[in-house]
Amino acid sequence: MIITIDGPSGTGKSTTAKALADHLHFNYCNTGKMYRTLAYARLQSPWATLPLTKFLEEPPFSFTFATGQPLESFFNGHLLTSELTTQEVANAASELSQLPEVRAFMQDLQRRYAQLGNCVFEGRDMGSKVFPNADLKIFLTSSPEVRAQRRLKDLPEGTLSPEQLQAELVKRDAADAQRAHDPLVIPENGIVIDSSDLTIRQVLEKILALLFRNEL
């Protein structure tokens, strides 16, 4: 079974997807983390100056794919954690994700991950592009104000003000929705859940109710 959870940043995708995967004992794939890993590697010297095709042919980053284990990111063998949470990396990931060759590279990896079986994927094009035949497709949304407050908790203190972050989110939304390749859209047969006034537990309960109702 494949469940996809799409939506813009700050809607609770990652936390919800992980909670759902834990509850169902499914594998969990955070595709945003995958794009940020690529972006982090691309920002480092000398990879920043390599032609993109060469960079993707011999990437200095890697991921662990194992049943029942969280997806981990590595750069030259070094485990990446807080390095992926900076605004610089987020901005670079947004720019690189516009490129069709980057998206094709990542989508291939994501489909390979699905071979583990019983997966929850979260991202921006999981239900619309990567897994259009997923068993259940969720699209999370939330107000920009709420999303900015949530994202602030993931950033180092003093990085951005709530107003600055909200502006960044709106800018990213526009870029995601308007990109030529695999834009952020509600997938066909996707179910929209507004998480603005909901806790993660409440969102999780809504998704579980859908699963049980449809006997998936």
Curated annotation (Swiss-Prot):
Question: For this protein, what is the EC number?
Answer: 2.7.4.25
Q: Is Membrane there in the keyword field?
A: no
A Pfam family that this protein carries is: Cytidylate_kin
Q: What is catalyzed by this enzyme? A: CMP + ATP = CDP + ADP; dCMP + ATP = dCDP + ADP
Q: GO cellular component terms? A: cytoplasm
Its EC top class is transferase
UniProt protein name: Cytidylate kinase
The beginning of the lineage is: Bacteria, Pseudomonadati, Chlamydiota, Chlamydiia, Chlamydiales
Q: Which gene encodes it?
A: cmk
